[in-house]
């Protein structure tokens, strides 16, 4: 028995010493260098220069999600994710996406309970174009009756496809409704058909004017650019 105990103790000592040796040689992640700015229009800007590849990735975070929707207007944040691709003063329907694709880039968006995020990845020499397009749709989005009604039907169909017509599609909605009895997280991001049908163009315009403003947004740029030059471009647009 004593021999077994001695062997066990020795094994534990060896394991402990090995763990300490491993801990001392652990590779630590590189330091993340970035600059944080607040512009005069209260837009928050985060810049992280990375010259490893000749591309730039941009995300613009609007700090509005399903938790911020007015009562009886669930799905508005997600609806606006769609509306932001439907043209502005200087860009036609879906032109934002097609321009990014034409230079070899990608763009998309997603909506959560807390945020609506739009992202673009482009070759670095198209940074100026990308910033101009984001500024254009933030300031001059085309919010008209025809596009609103068309996109509302798209969102309703998306709900039918992803939730209503799936065997367990509404399970998460029931779980959230039980977990958050009063908190706005109980409202599904996709919204309800009834709320979407009840919405009006005036509701949509009010939502846009309230939340899609520089003071409610954070722009993140990471990639192959000169930090000072990128900062000047953002201030320009």
Residue ranges and their predicted role:
Residues 21-97, 119-122, 128-135, 205-237:
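His/Glu-rich zincin catalytic helix
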Residues 12, 32-33, 56, 173, ...:
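Hydrophobic alpha-helical context, especially transmembrane and signal-peptide helices
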Residues 9-14, 204:
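Extended hydrophobic/Leu-rich segments
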Residues 1-11:
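Bacterial N-terminal signal peptides that target proteins for export
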